[in-house]
Amino acid sequence: NVTGGAFLEKITTNATIDLNSTTIGGQLNCTKATFEVEVDHAVNAQDAKINGGLIWREATVIKGTLSFANAHTSVLCDDESSWPSGGRVDLNGMTYDTIIGGPLDAKTRLAWLDKGSNWNGEFKPQPYTQLAKVLRAMGHDSDARQVLEKRDALLLKSYRKNLRKLSETTKNTTASHLATKSLAAAHWLFVDKLLGTLTGYGHQPFRSLRFLFLLIFLAAIPSHMAWTFGGFTPNSAVIQVSDDWKALSNTENAAEEWSSKTQAGRDWETFQAVAYATDLVIPIINIGQTDAWAPSTTRGAAGYHMWWLSWVFTIVGWIVTALGAAAITGVIRRD
């Protein structure tokens, strides 16, 4: 045990700094230190307890690895460039209470974690969870969510990697091999791409709103085209058998003519493409457009295609809305 601090500032060493299971009462200061250890740890601080804080700034690790596995420090004060790349850092299990004098943005911190969360080819999620916890406690909620999103993406990537390995071991059993490959493909499509893209694995729930707006825009285009080319009819059996509708039903754009200011349908719900698209895409909203108007498969190609597209937009809208609502609910519960 070290009752005071351990000051390694500006040292140059080719021997391992062994702090395994050491308790340091003060700081561990490695500012501007240079390490060049051929076949071992440059610093081995596994299970170390650093009560006064770890200062790791402007350090250079030419050769050797760093292990802070299961170490704890009250304060982390570092810069990203001092941590070596190439899988030479082990941060798994490392905990710290706060970050002072170091970067707090997600981009820089993710680059740091990328250096220290893979050890012997195996992904370790704990460094991401720890960083997110500290960032959230410090008030950096947005950066914390980005860190957790990246963690989950890498966890799923690791899961698929293990599935592929399992698939290789079951090549001699055709059914098991196909089942494993199918599971990996379905996992990639529905969990990774769908859930990740729409909600950031639940950590970016409001991202789904962008996709809803995009869906509304995409649905509004064929809706407008179908209306312009006479592909819509009133969504009412009573109106469709009425004499007023029958009198106009063979005109080029019967719906537009019937609902004009001088015709019987002038008081019917006015068609608006964006409102219709919103009604179509968002299932929890009822503006009244889809109740009033429906595309017809017998009134030209525009109406026919809109009839089919309405199913697509409705189903996709349900999926996006459901995932977004579930993600938002989850975030509210976590907060």
Predicted regions span which residues?
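Hydrophobic membrane-insertion alpha-helices, especially the h-region
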Residues: 213-221
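N-terminal leader/targeting and pre-domain segments
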Residues: 1-191
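Transmembrane alpha-helical segments in integral membrane proteins
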Residues: 312-334
